[in-house]
């Protein structure tokens, strides 16, 4: 009996390996338009790619079959109602074009693939993957409007991009442009049924941060990408399915200027203003019962001035924490003092942002703290990088703090911004209620050093009772495309050369 039981146990352990051995190969790492489960696809003929894992060497694919369906249930049942390629004799596995029915705007599609080896043995079907279509025409936006806090000042519209002080002075004389207030928007809505999928299509110009029920949507930085805005603007697609809740929900959006509106203040490499910062959004909710609901931007949205009091892609960013309104991103907030959003009437061509977003890649701690001959405190982060800072401080009042980033130092150890453009600074006005933390949202700079004005490092003499800084950390922001390879060898010089090239590419 014991021997029989032992044999059964051995068979149970070994049997899966026999099953695995029967599979000559498998399909994995599926990609659509070179992304895993992408959103915002606009081409009517997306391309599919996959990789093959085989047990034998010199494997060669002899054929493939792709199924595409408009529901996972159909695909699971083997029904490719959008495309069934049939067994296609081909060794191709990279950028295989879709050749099925017309793809619809805003629709999510499901696909899988299998392949045959040169002995005509098929693999098992791959796991199911998805791709989501973007909004393909103006009508797909369901009458969403570009909304703003302020009207455009028509006599200040500059879309050609003025380079250099001489050109700016000649064209604008003493006129300041781009001095619009930075807005934040909110909209509440109700979800009353189980949600199958929810997708947001968002363009906030120059840049936006979006929040749902108080939580930031995505980890993107400086969305959307830069364009010639009177020719086209990019929108970004987000899957909100896991963030919506039954009952009341609230959307909040903050805008920065970016290249859409460059104020004629501080440093500017070029000057342009397409008008007041503005927002366009459509949220498409698909319910489990097959019904749908659209939430779109319009004059029923509420808006007010945000705590971001200055935003320039070239000159920096200021934030006044005393202007924060607790709970404004949450449902139930009292927004009766807010304004109705303005319909700008503006139009431009809209394209889906298909590149990987900028994100925070690394946190870079302070490695050295020193005082200049003039008495300013300087934080040395140990390496040059592009990005922003993370500031934490303790304050008993609202004394403003300025942080000057720079790549270089002057002979007297003060920061030198000549290599990157001056003047540039991050400004923060605390609430004055203890520990506070902040990081800029709509600008970036290349720097290693941070010089402080209006605060002192914690633990240092502070006879004037200034805010005390407990942390300055660098946040390295860069392109977030995944690494697909690396290099390392026994020669330190080659490794260092590779590292320099790598850092240059991702900055």
In which residue ranges do the predicted regions lie?
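Bacterial Sec-dependent N-terminal signal peptides
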Residues: 1-26
């Amino acid at each position: 009996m014991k021997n029989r039981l032992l044999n059964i146990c051995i068979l149970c352990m070994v049997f899966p390996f026999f099953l695995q051995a029967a599979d000559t190969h498998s399909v994995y790492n599926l990609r659509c338009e070179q992304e895993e489960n992408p959103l915002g696809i606009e081409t009517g003929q997306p391309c599919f790619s996959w990789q093959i894992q085989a047990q034998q060497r010199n494997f060669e694919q002899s054929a493939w079959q792709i199924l595409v369906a408009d529901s996972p249930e159909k695909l699971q049942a083997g029904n490719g109602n959008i495309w069934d390629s049939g067994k296609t004799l081909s060794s191709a596995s990279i950028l295989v074009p879709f050749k099925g029915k017309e793809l619809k705007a805003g629709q999510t599609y499901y696909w899988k693939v299998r392949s045959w080896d040169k002995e005509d043995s098929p693999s098992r079907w791959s796991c199911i993957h998805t791709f989501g279509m973007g909004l393909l025409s103006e009508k797909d936006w369901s009458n969403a409007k570009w909304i703003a806090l302020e009207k455009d000042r028509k006599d200040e519209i500059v879309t050609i991009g003025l380079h250099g002080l001489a050109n700016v002075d000649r064209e604008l004389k003493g006129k300041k442009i781009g001095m619009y207030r930075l807005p934040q928007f909110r909209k509440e809505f109700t979800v009353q049924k189980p949600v199958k999928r929810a997708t947001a299509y968002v363009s906030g110009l120059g840049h936006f941060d979006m929040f749902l029920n108080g939580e930031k949507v995505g980890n993107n930085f400086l969305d959307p990408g830069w364009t010639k805005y009177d020719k086209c603007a990019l929108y970004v697609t987000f899957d909100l399915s896991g963030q919506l809740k039954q009952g009341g929900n609230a959307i909040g959006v903050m805008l920065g200027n970016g290249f859409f509106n460059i104020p004629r203040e501080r440093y500017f490499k070029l000057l342009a203003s397409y008008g007041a910062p503005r927002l366009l959004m459509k949220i498409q909710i698909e319910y489990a019962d097959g019904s749908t609901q659209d939430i779109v931007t319009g004059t029923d949205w509420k808006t007010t001035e945000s705590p971001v009091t200055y935003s320039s892609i070239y000159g920096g960013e200021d934030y006044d924490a005393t202007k924060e309104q607790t709970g404004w991103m949450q449902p139930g907030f009292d927004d009766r003092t807010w304004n109705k959003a303005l319909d700008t009437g503006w139009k431009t061509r809209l394209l889906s942002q298909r590149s990987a977003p900028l994100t925070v890649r690394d946190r870079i701690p302070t490695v050295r703290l020193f005082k200049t001959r003039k008495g300013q405190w300087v934080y040395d982060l140990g390496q040059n990088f592009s990005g922003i800072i993370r500031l934490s401080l303790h304050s008993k009042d609202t004394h403003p703090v300025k942080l000057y980033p720079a790549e270089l130092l002057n002979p007297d150890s003060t920061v030198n911004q000549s290599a990157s453009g001056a003047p540039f600074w991050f400004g923060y006005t605390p609430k004055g209620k203890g520990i506070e933390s902040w990081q800029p949202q709509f600008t970036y700079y290349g720097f290693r050093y941070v010089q402080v004005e209006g605060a002192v490092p914690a633990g240092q003499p502070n006879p004037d009772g200034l805010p005390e800084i407990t942390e300055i950390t660098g946040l390295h922001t860069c392109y977030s495309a995944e690494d697909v390879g690396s290099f390392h060898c026994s020669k330190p010089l080659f490794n260092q050369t590779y590292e320099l090239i790598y850092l240059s590419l991702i900055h």
